[in-house]
């Protein structure tokens, strides 16, 4: 199957309407053409700055607009981030993702963020960040520090977007993706299913991703995790078969991308997750929490992988204990030498 960038909503809707077994079979055929069928890429996601976000995303418990149980926290110290990255490495992750609840990073944060990137790279993991909107200059800085992936989801279709968020435009999101690509980084971008959107909106989201000049290297598909206190806490559950169809269609129209089974896995049984892998999902987040939402523990994932004969992708070479100690010491020295350290922490709602 050739890689296309001219998919239409009508074509994608037609895929959704295929008999379920036919759709999954086609997706598995495409998957086997471009990927090893029994390999899954494993990432770990850490919240490096939690809560008090000025955006009004109706699904998000970190928004300052809603009363949830999420406690606001300042930007994590570099040492704590690297400690979490080391643990992720030991647990089997190959990529370490760092997320901050910001509208956009401020310039005073950039030195800290770049130290995090360099430190995680030194540990031997791929790096990914999601920091909100970024400028072209910030994208260049992050790329210069060695950031491999930048995540910025489109969330939903352009038509339904206004029902989800009003503090950031759809074009803002597309502009950020353009800055990321221009800086030479890989793109991680997907959406959330189950926010009350129509099947046409789901098709529209995938078309937006599949008609980018270059398909995202990673496409996370999230199932809404309903959180008390957010406007979407009572939205109707998405049908599991509809969710699996999303995975299958994403695999068919973006054949070379990694399709990540992302948030919501805690509410999926093993059978549903297995059908998602059959439909072309070949990446997961590993660990008991995704930012502030629950996720299956490592043991559960390893048990499921063993049942299915799935192997996680090979890690890069891991530094030995002495090397790790030296690397942490070097990063600590860089941080301690920076003037105005305390000024790098701030309230994101200001």
Swiss-Prot record:
Cofactor annotation: [4Fe-4S] cluster; [2Fe-2S] cluster
Keyword Transcription regulation part of the UniProt annotation: no
InterPro entries cross-referenced by the UniProt entry: Aldolase_TIM, BATS_dom, Biotin_synth/BioAB, Biotin_synthase, Elp3/MiaA/NifB-like_rSAM, rSAM
Membrane-spanning segments: none
Domain Radical SAM core: 38-257
Associated pathway: Cofactor biosynthesis; biotin biosynthesis; biotin from 7,8-diaminononanoate: step 2/2
Cofactor: binding comment: Binds 1 [4Fe-4S] cluster. The cluster is coordinated with 3 cysteines and an exchangeable S-adenosyl-L-methionine. Binds 1 [2Fe-2S] cluster. The cluster is coordinated with 3 cysteines and 1 arginine.
Keyword Metal-binding: yes
Short name of any one Pfam family annotated for the protein: BATS
Taxonomy, superkingdom: Bacteria
Substrates-to-products reaction catalysed: (4R,5S)-dethiobiotin + (sulfur carrier)-SH + 2 reduced [2Fe-2S]-[ferredoxin] + 2 S-adenosyl-L-methionine = (sulfur carrier)-H + biotin + 2 5'-deoxyadenosine + 2 L-methionine + 2 oxidized [2Fe-2S]-[ferredoxin]
Record: residues binding [4Fe-4S] cluster: 53, 57, 60
Function summary: Catalyzes the conversion of dethiobiotin (DTB) to biotin by the insertion of a sulfur atom into dethiobiotin via a radical-based mechanism.
NCBIfam families linked: bioB
Subunit record text: Homodimer.
HAMAP family reported for this sequence: BioB
Protein name per the record: Biotin synthase
Classification lineage: Bacteria, Pseudomonadati, Pseudomonadota, Gammaproteobacteria, Vibrionales
């Amino acid at each position: 199957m050739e890689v296309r960038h001219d998919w239409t909503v009508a074509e994608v809707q037609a895929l959704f309407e295929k008999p379920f077994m036919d759709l999954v079979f086609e997706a598995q055929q495409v998957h086997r053409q471009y990927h090893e069928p029994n390999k899954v890429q494993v990432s770990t996601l850490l919240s490096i700055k939690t809560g008090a976000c000025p955006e009004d995303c109706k699904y998000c418990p970190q928004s300052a607009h809603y009363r949830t149980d999420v406690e606001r926290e300042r930007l994590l110290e570099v040492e704590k981030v690297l400690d979490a990255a080391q643990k992720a490495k030991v647990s089997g992750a190959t990529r370490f993702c760092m997320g901050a609840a910001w509208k956009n990073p401020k310039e005073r944060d950039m030195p800290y963020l770049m130290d995090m990137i360099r430190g995680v790279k030194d540990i031997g993991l791929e790096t990914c960040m999601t920091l909100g909107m970024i400028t072209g200059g910030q994208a260049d800085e992050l790329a210069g520090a060695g950031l491999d992936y930048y995540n910025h989801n489109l969330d939903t279709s352009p038509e339904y977007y206004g029902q989800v968020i009003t503090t950031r435009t759809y074009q803002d999101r597309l502009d950020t993706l353009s800055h990321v690509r221009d800086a030479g980084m890989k793109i991680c971008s997907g959406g959330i299913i189950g926010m009350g959107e129509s099947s046409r909106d789901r098709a529209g989201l995938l078309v937006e991703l599949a008609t980018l000049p270059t398909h995202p290297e990673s496409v996370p598909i999230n199932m809404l995790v309903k959180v008390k206190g957010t406007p979407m806490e009572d939205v109707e559950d998405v049908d599991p078969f509809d969710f699996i169809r999303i995975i299958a269609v994403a695999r068919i129209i973006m054949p070379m991308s990694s399709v990540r089974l992302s948030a919501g896995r805690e509410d999926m049984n093993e059978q549903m997750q297995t059908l998602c892998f059959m439909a072309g999902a070949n990446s997961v987040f590993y660990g008991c929490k995704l930012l502030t939402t629950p996720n299956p523990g490592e043991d559960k994932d390893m048990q499921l992988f063993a049942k299915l004969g799935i192997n996680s992708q090979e890690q890069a070479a891991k530094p030995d204990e002495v090397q790790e100690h030296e690397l942490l010491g070097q990063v600590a020295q860089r941080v301690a030498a920076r003037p105005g350290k305390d000024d790098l922490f701030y309230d994101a709602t200001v």
